[in-house]
C-alpha cells in the first residue's frame, strides 16, 4: 500500500517521531504481508466492489442535472456585481464570508486536497456559524430585489457583463472540465461539477478518489467508510452536530460530557464523535478511561469465565490531575465467576487432566482508532506493542480492517503475563498511551479491547462516567470442522446466538489477511448435512451460517481465526487450523480419542460444542508451532516461554502415543530452529529448561525412528490389556518424566517455569455454554504406556516362536488323524509318497 506523499498522515501524532528518524516502512506492520489495497479491505458490498473493479470514470459519473435558470442568473452575477444600494441593503443581514480556500496558495497551485490545518479550522468555524444562524433565523429565502438587482446589473452592463463574472471556471477533474459558471457558489468555490461531486469515484492524479462533501476536497477511497459521502474525520464532527441522540438503551448516562457521544454500537462506524478537535503538538494529552461494563444478554447459565485467558475484578483509578493522563480501568462483568469456575471444576464430567493444557494461552487485543489511515501505520508500532506487554510474547499476529480503523492483534504468551495484564490493565494502558514517542499520543479518543475488557480512552479527562451497557453481544458457540487442508476450499458451519443483527459481518483472518468468503444463513427449519460427516443437524434455537472460502494458499500453514461482528459489537473468536493432509487425517483420530461420544445432551449443537472445547487449546498451539515465524521472531525461538510450549506439546503427544502428529511437530522443529542449531546446543553448557527440551527432542526422534516396532508393540498392548488394567492412567494423565523419557524428574516442566511457579491450565478461547464441558473418553479407548505391560519377546525370538507354533500345529494335526481316522492315513500318505518318489528318481 503506497504511503501518501510527504508522510503527512503521521505528522499530527503528537511529536512522537524524531526528525532524524528514517522513513517508516508503511507496508509492513505485524507481518501483514500487504500486497495491495484489496488485501486489507473486506468485501463491504456490491457498491464498493463495483467502484474498485471499474476504473472507467465515465461509467461512475451520474448524469449531470441542469441548474435552474433563475438560480443560475442569480449566482452568475455574484456578489461582485451588486450595486452599492444592494450592498447597503444586504448589510442589515448576515453576509456569508468568503471561503478562505480561494486565497490558499496550495489550493490555487492545484495541490488538491491541500493540507492546511488553519484553513480547516476556519472552515469549521464557518460551518458552525452557518448552522447557528439557520437555527436562529430559520430557513432564509432569497430576496426578490436581489435577483432583480443582479439581473439589472448584468443587463445594464451590456457588452461589458463579462467583467463582473469569472473569466473561466471549469471542473478540476481531468477529462471532465465542465463549465461551472452557472452552478451555485459552493461548486464554484470548490471547482467541482455536479457529476464529479456525486460520483462514487473519479480518476484524479492517477488515483481513484471521491469527493468529500464536508471538506470540499477529493480523498482516496480508503478515507471513506463503505458508501459514505464524507470522510471519517469530518463525519465525526458533522454527526455530533446534526444527528439526534439515540434512545436511552445502549447510550452513555446523561451526565457525560458534551464533548463526546457514544452509541451502543461497540464496533460500528462513527459511534465516537468528537466536537472539539485540537491537535497542537505542544499540548499535553488529557484522557480518561471511562468504565464501560458490558452486561451481555447471554443464555441462562452461560460460562463467561472460559472466554479469555483472564477475567479480573473491576478496578477504578481516578486521577483528575491535568498534567497526567488519567484512566479508570474496568472489566466486563463476569457474573458468578468464582461460582461458575468452582462448579465447572467439581463437575464429574469435566476432567482437566484429560484435556490439553497450554503453557501459552492465546488472547486478543483490539485497537479502534478514529484518525488513522491504514496506509499510514508505521512499522515501529509493533515494537511498541511488544514493550507494552512488558515481555516479548511468544506469538503475535495482527490484522487491519476499515470501519474507522480497527487493528486486531492475536497474542500468545504465558499465563502469568495474562494475569499481570488482567490485574493492572489500567496502568498498562496508561503507559501505552503516555510512553515516550508513543504513536497513540495526540491521536484523540479511541477504544482498546483486551479480551473481554473494553477501555474507552478519551481526549478530555474532565469528566469520568461509569456506564453499564445493556446490549446483546454476538456469541459463537462452535465452528465445524475445526481444521482444513491447505490449498483446498474451506467450507465450514458457524453456530451462535445473536449473530444475525444489523451490520452483520463475518471475519476469517489467516496469515495476516482477511480472507474473502461467502457467508449465508441457513434457516432454522432447514435440515443440512454437516461437512465431512453424514450427520444431520436440525436446530431451532441457534443461528447457523455457512461460510465458503474458495481459494487458500497451498504452502501456508498455521492458525486462522473466525469472528462475527454486528451493531452490538464484536463476538468471541474461535481458532481453526490450516495444515497438511496428513495432519488433518491425524487430527480426526485425535478428536475421537479426546472426546469420544457423549450422551449428556441430545442437542446436536450442544454436542458439537462439547466436542470442540476439548480441542481448541490443542489446535491453536499446533497452529502456532507449524506456522513459519517472521524475521523478528527468530531471536525469540529459544526463549523460556517458547521452549516450555514445545515441551508441553511433545510431552502430551508422547504420553498419549500420538506418534504421527509427533513426527509432524519434530519435522517442524527441525525446519524452524534447524538441526544444526540443536546439535550445537547439545555441545555447550545449558540451563535446565534447555536440557529438558533437548531430552524431549531426542526421545521424540527415537520414537519416530522406531515407529514400525512401536506400532506393533502398541497393537499387542491394546489387545492384551483390554479391560484388565482398570488402574491404568486415562488419556492425558501426566506420568513421571523419568518413566516416559528416562531423564531425571527434577527437570520437570513445572519446576522450570520460574515465571509462574505453578501448573498452568489453558482457559478456553470461546465463551462456552454450561453444558460445554470436556467429556470423558470411553473406557475402551485406552492409550497405554509400554511400561504398563510386561516385556514381550521380539526380533529373532518372535520368529522362533512362530516356527515352533507352526510345527506344533502340524504334529498335532497328524496325531489326530492317526488316532481318530486310521483308515484315512493311507489316503493322505499316497500323495506324499508319490511326491517323494518323484523327487528321488529325478
Swiss-Prot record:
**Superkingdom per UniProt:** Eukaryota
Q: Where does Zn(2+) 1 bind?
A: 171, 176, 193, 196
Tell me yes or no: is Nucleus among this UniProt entry's keywords. Answer: yes
A GO cellular component annotation here is: nucleus
Q: Where is this region: Disordered?
A: 1-22, 59-97, 140-168, 236-256
- Stretches of Gly residues bias are at 1-18, 146-162
Q: Which SUPFAM superfamilies match?
A: SBT domain
Record-listed Zn(2+) 2 binding positions: 212, 215, 219, 231
Q: Name one GO molecular function term.
A: DNA binding
**Keyword set for this entry?**
DNA-binding, Metal-binding, Nucleus, Transcription, Transcription regulation, Zinc, Zinc-finger
Zinc finger spans (SBP-type)?
Answer: 168-245
Concerning Gene3D superfamilies, the annotation shows:
Transcription factor, SBP-box domain
Transcription as UniProt keyword: yes
* Tissue expression notes: Ubiquitous.
Q: Biased composition, Low complexity: where in the chain?
A: 69-85
Per the Swiss-Prot or TrEMBL annotation, the motif Bipartite nuclear localization signal is positioned at: 228-244
**Where is this chain compositionally biased, Basic residues type?**
236-246
Major localization listed first in the record, in broad terms:
nucleus
Q: Where in the cell is it found?
A: Nucleus
The disulfide bonds in this chain are: none
Describe the function of this protein.
Trans-acting factor that binds specifically to the consensus nucleotide sequence 5'-TNCGTACAA-3'.
In the record's own words, the domains note is:
The SBP-type zinc finger is required for the binding to DNA.
Record protein name field = Squamosa promoter-binding-like protein 9
Amino acid at each position: 500500500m503506497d504511503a501518501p506523499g510527504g508522510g503527512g498522515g503521521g505528522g499530527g501524532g503528537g511529536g512522537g517521531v524524531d526528525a532524524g528518524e528514517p522513513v517508516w516502512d508503511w507496508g509492513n506492520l505485524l507481518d501483514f504481508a500487504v500486497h495491495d489495497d484489496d488485501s486489507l479491505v473486506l468485501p463491504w458490498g456490491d457498491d464498493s466492489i463495483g467502484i474498485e473493479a471499474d476504473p472507467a470514470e465515465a461509467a461512475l459519473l451520474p448524469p449531470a442535472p441542469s441548474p435552474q435558470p433563475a438560480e443560475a442568473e442569480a449566482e452568475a452575477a455574484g456578489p461582485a456585481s451588486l450595486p452599492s444600494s444592494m450592498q447597503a441593503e444586504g448589510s442589515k443581514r448576515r453576509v456569508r464570508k468568503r471561503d478562505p480556500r480561494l486565497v490558499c496558495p496550495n489550493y490555487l497551485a492545484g495541490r488538491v486536497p491541500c493540507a492546511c490545518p488553519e484553513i480547516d479550522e476556519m472552515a469549521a468555524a464557518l460551518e458552525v456559524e452557518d448552522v447557528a444562524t439557520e437555527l436562529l433565523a430559520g430557513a432564509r429565502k432569497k430576496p426578490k430585489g436581489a435577483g432583480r438587482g443582479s439581473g439589472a446589473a448584468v443587463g445594464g452592463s451590456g457588452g461589458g457583463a463579462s467583467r463582473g463574472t469569472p473569466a473561466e471556471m471549469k471542473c478540476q477533474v481531468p477529462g471532465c472540465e465542465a463549465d461551472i459558471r452557472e452552478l451555485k457558489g459552493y461548486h464554484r468555490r470548490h471547482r467541482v461539477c455536479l457529476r464529479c461531486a456525486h460520483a462514487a469515484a473519479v480518476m484524479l492524479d492517477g488515483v481513484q478518489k471521491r469527493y468529500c462533501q464536508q471538506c470540499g476536497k477529493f480523498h482516496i477511497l480508503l478515507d471513506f467508510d463503505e458508501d459514505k459521502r464524507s470522510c471519517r474525520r469530518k463525519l465525526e464532527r458533522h454527526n455530533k452536530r446534526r444527528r439526534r441522540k439515540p434512545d436511552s438503551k445502549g447510550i452513555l448516562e446523561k451526565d457525560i460530557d458534551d464533548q463526546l457521544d457514544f452509541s451502543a454500537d461497540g464496533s460500528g462506524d462513527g459511534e465516537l464523535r468528537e466536537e472539539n478537535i485540537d491537535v497542537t503538538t505542544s499540548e499535553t494529552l488529557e484522557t480518561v478511561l471511562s468504565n464501560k461494563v458490558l452486561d451481555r444478554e447471554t443464555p441462562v447459565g452461560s460460562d463467561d469465565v472460559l472466554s479469555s485467558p483472564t477475567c479480573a475484578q473491576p478496578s477504578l483509578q481516578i486521577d483528575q490531575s491535568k498534567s497526567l493522563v488519567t484512566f479508570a480501568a474496568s472489566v466486563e462483568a463476569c457474573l458468578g465467576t468464582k461460582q461458575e469456575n468452582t462448579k465447572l471444576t467439581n463437575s464429574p464430567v469435566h476432567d482437566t487432566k484429560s484435556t490439553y493444557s497450554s503453557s501459552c494461552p492465546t488472547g486478543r487485543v483490539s485497537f479502534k482508532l478514529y484518525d488513522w489511515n491504514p496506509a499510514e501505520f508505521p512499522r515501529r508500532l509493533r515494537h511498541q506493542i511488544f514493550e507494552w506487554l512488558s515481555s516479548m510474547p511468544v506469538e503475535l499476529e495482527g490484522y487491519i480492517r476499515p470501519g474507522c480503523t480497527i487493528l486486531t492483534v492475536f497474542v500468545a504468551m504465558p499465563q502469568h503475563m495474562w494475569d499481570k495484564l488482567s490485574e493492572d490493565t489500567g496502568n498498562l494502558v496508561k503507559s501505552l498511551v503516555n510512553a515516550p514517542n508513543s504513536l497513540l499520543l495526540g491521536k484523540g479518543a479511541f477504544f482498546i479491547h483486551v479480551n473481554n475488557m473494553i477501555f474507552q480512552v478519551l481526549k478530555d479527562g474532565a469528566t469520568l462516567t461509569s456506564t453499564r451497557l445493556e446490549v446483546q453481544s454476538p456469541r459463537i458457540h462452535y465452528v465445524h470442522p475445526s481444521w482444513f487442508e491447505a490449498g483446498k476450499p474451506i467450507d465450514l458451519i458457524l453456530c451462535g446466538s445473536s449473530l444475525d443483527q444489523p451490520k452483520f459481518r463475518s471475519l476469517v483472518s489467516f496469515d495476516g489477511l482477511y480472507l474473502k468468503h461467502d457467508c449465508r444463513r441457513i434457516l432454522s427449519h432447514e435440515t443440512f448435512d454437516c461437512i465431512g460427516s453424514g450427520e444431520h443437524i436440525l436446530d431451532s434455537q441457534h443461528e447457523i451460517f455457512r461460510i465458503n472460502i474458495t481459494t487458500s494458499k497451498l504452502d501456508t500453514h498455521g492458525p486462522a481465526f473466525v469472528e462475527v461482528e454486528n451493531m452490538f459489537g464484536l463476538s468471541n473468536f474461535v481458532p481453526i487450523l490450516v495444515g497438511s493432509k496428513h495432519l488433518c487425517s491425524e487430527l480426526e483420530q485425535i478428536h475421537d480419542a479426546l472426546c469420544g461420544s457423549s450422551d449428556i445432551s441430545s442437542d446436536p449443537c450442544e454436542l458439537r460444542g462439547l466436542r470442540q472445547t476439548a480441542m481448541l487449546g490443542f489446535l491453536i498451539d499446533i497452529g502456532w508451532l507449524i506456522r513459519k515465524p517472521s524475521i523478528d521472531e527468530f531471536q525469540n525461538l529459544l526463549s523460556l516461554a517458547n521452549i516450555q510450549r514445545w515441551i508441553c506439546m511433545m510431552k502430551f503427544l508422547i504420553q498419549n502415543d500420538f506418534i504421527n502428529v509427533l513426527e509432524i511437530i519434530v519435522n517442524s522443529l527441525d525446519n524452524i530452529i534447524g538441526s544444526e542449531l540443536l546439535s550445537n546446543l547439545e555441545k555447550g553448557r545449558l540451563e535446565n529448561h534447555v536440557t529438558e527440551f533437548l531430552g524431549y527432542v531426542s526421545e521424540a526422534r527415537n520414537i519416530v525412528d522406531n515407529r514400525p516396532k512401536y506400532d506393533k508393540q502398541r497393537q499387542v498392548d491394546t489387545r492384551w490389556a483390554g479391560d484388565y488394567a482398570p488402574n491404568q492412567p486415562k488419556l492425558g494423565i501426566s506420568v513421571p518424566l523419568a518413566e516416559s523419557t528416562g531423564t531425571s524428574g527434577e527437570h520437570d516442566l513445572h519446576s522450570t517455569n520460574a515465571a509462574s511457579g505453578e501448573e498452568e491450565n489453558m482457559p478456553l478461547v470461546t465463551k462456552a455454554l454450561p453444558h460445554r464441558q470436556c467429556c470423558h473418553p470411553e473406557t475402551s479407548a485406552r492409550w497405554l504406556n509400554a511400561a504398563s505391560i510386561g516385556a514381550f519377546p521380539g526380533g529373532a525370538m518372535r520368529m522362533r516362536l512362530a516356527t515352533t507354533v507352526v510345527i506344533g500345529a502340524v504334529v498335532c494335526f497328524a496325531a489326530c488323524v492317526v488316532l481318530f481316522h486310521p483308515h484315512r492315513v493311507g489316503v493322505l500318505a499316497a500323495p506324499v509318497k508319490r511326491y517323494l518318489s518323484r523327487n528321488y528318481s529325478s
